[in-house]
Curated annotation (Swiss-Prot):
Pfam families: Queuosine_synth (PF02547). PANTHER family: S-ADENOSYLMETHIONINE:TRNA RIBOSYLTRANSFERASE-ISOMERASE (PTHR30307:SF0). Monomer. GO terms for molecular function: S-adenosylmethionine:tRNA ribosyltransferase-isomerase activity. Keywords: Cytoplasm, Queuosine biosynthesis, S-adenosyl-L-methionine, Transferase. Transfers and isomerizes the ribose moiety from AdoMet to the 7-aminomethyl group of 7-deazaguanine (preQ1-tRNA) to give epoxyqueuosine (oQ-tRNA). Its main location: cytoplasm. Transmembrane segments: none annotated. GO terms for cellular component: cytoplasm. This is S-adenosylmethionine:tRNA ribosyltransferase-isomerase. It catalyses: 7-aminomethyl-7-carbaguanosine(34) in tRNA + S-adenosyl-L-methionine = epoxyqueuosine(34) in tRNA + adenine + L-methionine + 2 H(+). Belongs to the QueA family. It is found in: Cytoplasm.
Length: 341
């Protein structure tokens, strides 16, 4: 299958640069994957499309302020780190720019010297392995010095760090937010529970690989990035109970979808499990775990539009995206939402 089959024209002004004041007031497109029928609504009305006995599966990862701006210890030259993956207590895999300044053995200073980094090695994808030196708790140092690593297509500075977190974010570890969850407020989640819909939490720490473009023209040749997930025994049992009783499993976001499809058996039952997943879902994939998906509007030719095309049908998705552009829906991380059922 060709990457170009997932291309669509997107005017730049439709790329949302900041979140709406009221999370749940974003627009909602409802796509029936069997008929291709489309409805338009507001996210806070999502309860109209849910039924008692359904189960929403949400990703409770928390974004860390993983972007660090510092300077080279000897020359003072500016450097930017983005933390990707913790290897041990003080060692991380990072992205760095400009890369030419980050040679093995070089050291960098952040803040007023509260954090110092030494380059230990390079990685296959052009990143670096670094060791950090600091006093106290690393997370506290990072919270003081780091910035939210918002996606490259967002040019505005984020005024409030909390707006790039879901209201239920709990476990730190992501370099990007699971953005479908940004539309939920505490009040809306409570309303959903009151109507007899379960909310179950799993964890997948989102990596920056989620923004990595597909460079291969034949998409089957694309190498997917790895992300760490945790599905607890309690979460697996709750989801499996819904499956047994005939309710629908609705994944909130592509990250929840990736996780559930990774841990599901052939009958769609979920196993308690943790580990790394590099699952790549594109048209032709047979879904085992989910009956519905809540998701944002994704980049042309991205792995995410390929995943939603696998779930709803490529023709349905490309037509829905064409309508979304015509109706001026807001796209990407801070944009509007789609419910596929």
């Amino acid at each position: 299958m060709k990457r170009s089959e997932f291309y669509f024209e997107l005017p730049e002004e439709l790329i949302a640069q900041e979140p709406l004041e009221d999370r749940a007031s974003s627009r909602l497109m409802i796509l029936n994957k069997k008929t291709g029928e489309i409805e338009h609504d507001i996210f806070k009305n999502i309860t109209k499309y849910l039924k008692p006995g359904d189960c929403l599966v949400l990703n409770n990862t928390k974004v860390i302020p993983a972007r660090l701006i510092g300077r080279r210890e000897d020359s003072g030259g500016k450097i930017e780190f983005v933390l990707l993956k913790r290897i041990s207590n003080n060692e991380w895999e990072i992205l760095v720019k400009p890369g030419r300044r980050a040679k093995i053995g070089s050291k960098f200073v952040f803040g007023n010297g509260e954090l110092i980094a030494e380059i230990l090695d390079t990685t296959d994808v052009g990143g670096r392995i670094v060791r950090f030196y600091y006093e106290g708790v690393f997370e506290e140092v990072l919270d003081k010095l780091g910035e939210m690593p918002v996606p490259p297509y967002i040019k505005k500075k984020l005024k409030n760090k909390d707006r790039y977190q879901t209201v239920y974010a709990k476990y730190e570890g992501s370099a990007a937010a699971p953005t479908a969850g940004l539309h939920f407020t505490e009040e809306l989640l409570e309303k959903i529970r009151q109507m007899g819909v379960k909310t179950v939490f799993i964890t997948l720490h989102v990596g920056l690989g989620t923004f990595r473009p597909v460079k291969e023209e034949v998409i089957e040749n694309h190498k997917m990035h790895e992300e760490f997930y945790i599905v607890t025994k309690e979460a697996a049992e709750e989801i499996n109970e819904t499956r047994k009783s005939g309710g629908r499993i609705i994944a909130v976001g592509t990250t929840s979808t990736r996780t559930l499809e990774t841990v599901a058996d052939e009958d769609g039952y979920i196993k308690e499990k943790s580990g790394w997943t590099d699952i790549f879902i594109y048209p032709g994939y047979k879904f085992k775990a989910i009956d519905g998906m809540i998701t944002n509007f994704h980049l042309p030719e991205s792995t995410l539009i390929m995943m939603v095309s696998a779930f709803a049908g490529k023709e349905n998705i490309m037509r829905a995206y064409k309508i979304a552009v015509e109706k001026k829906y807001r796209f990407f991380s801070f944009g509007d939402a789609m419910l596929i059922i």
